[in-house]
């Protein structure tokens, strides 16, 4: 019985990995059908539906992976790092690095892969970005408590600026067909971003 569950879990992971790879390829700029996905995995469409009730559920699983990966790592950054600017830098670098290491998933983050799918999926991505922005805002607000001095600019504005930078770099990565990596020249860009944090 345990062997059967492991095989089922492995097949589910294989399906999700194939979907992510298809999103990374030129297929990712077009609607991905279950027929194409089944052919990529080497199974029938019926076999896909034995593991996932719908293609939407496949995207849900990929979004869950994205959420878990990012939120877990953000929490680790907040636990380990106490300096506000260092926290912000690490969170921004995390978002950019995650996108760079997972190009197919970046198409989901930017919404490109979800254009032909249910609106609910885009809503989940919107919620994820809202959570990240709220976390950035909280880090910015905690500066006054941690370091005795806050920012002169509204923390809401600063948080949205940081997130807009991340979203812009991820969109550029997708638009360039993954040529312009989000972390390229990050060490030169960060001082420009940090200079806005006043």
Curated annotation (Swiss-Prot):
Cellular compartments annotated: Cytoplasm, Nucleoid
Molecular function in Gene Ontology: DNA-binding transcription factor activity; transcription cis-regulatory region binding
InterPro entries on file: DNA-bd_HTH_TetR-type_CS, Homeodomain-like_sf, HTH-type_TetR-like_transc_reg, HTH_TetR, NO_SlmA, SlmA-like_C, Tet_transcr_reg_TetR-rel_C_sf
Keyword field contains Cell division: yes
UniProt name for this protein: Nucleoid occlusion factor SlmA
Function text: Required for nucleoid occlusion (NO) phenomenon, which prevents Z-ring formation and cell division over the nucleoid. Acts as a DNA-associated cell division inhibitor that binds simultaneously chromosomal DNA and FtsZ, and disrupts the assembly of FtsZ polymers. SlmA-DNA-binding sequences (SBS) are dispersed on non-Ter regions of the chromosome, preventing FtsZ polymerization at these regions.
Residue ranges that the Swiss-Prot or TrEMBL entry lists as coiled coil: 117-144
GO CC annotations on file: bacterial nucleoid; cytoplasm
DNA-binding region: 33-52
BP term (GO), one: cell division
PANTHER family recorded: HTH-TYPE TRANSCRIPTIONAL REGULATOR RUTR, NUCLEOID OCCLUSION FACTOR SLMA
Stored NCBIfam families: PRK09480.1
Family: Belongs to the nucleoid occlusion factor SlmA family.
Keywords from the named record: Cell cycle, Cell division, Coiled coil, Cytoplasm, DNA-binding
Quaternary structure and interacting proteins, as annotated: Homodimer. Interacts with FtsZ.
Residues annotated as domain HTH tetR-type: 10-70
């Amino acid at each position: 019985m345990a062997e059967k569950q492991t095989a089922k879990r492995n097949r589910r992971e294989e399906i999700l990995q194939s979907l992510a790879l298809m999103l990374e390829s030129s297929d990712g700029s077009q609607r991905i059908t279950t027929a194409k996905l089944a052919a990529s995995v080497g199974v029938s469409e019926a076999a896909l539906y034995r593991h996932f009730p719908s293609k939407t559920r496949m995207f849900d699983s990929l979004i869950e992976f994205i959420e878990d990966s990012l939120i877990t790592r953000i929490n680790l950054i907040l636990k380990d790092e106490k300096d506000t600017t260092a926290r912000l830098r690490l969170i921004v670098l995390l978002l950019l690095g995650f996108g760079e290491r997972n190009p197919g998933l970046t198409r989901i983050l930017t919404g490109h892969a979800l254009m032909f799918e249910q609106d609910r999926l885009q809503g989940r991505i919107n919620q994820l970005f809202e959570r990240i922005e709220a976390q950035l805002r909280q880090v910015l607000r905690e500066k006054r408590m941690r370091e005795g001095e806050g920012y002169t600019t509204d923390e809401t504005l600063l948080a949205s600026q940081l997130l807009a930078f991340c979203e812009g770099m991820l969109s550029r990565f997708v638009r360039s067909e993954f040529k312009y990596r989000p972390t390229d020249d990050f060490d030169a860009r960060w001082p420009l971003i940090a200079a806005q944090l006043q």
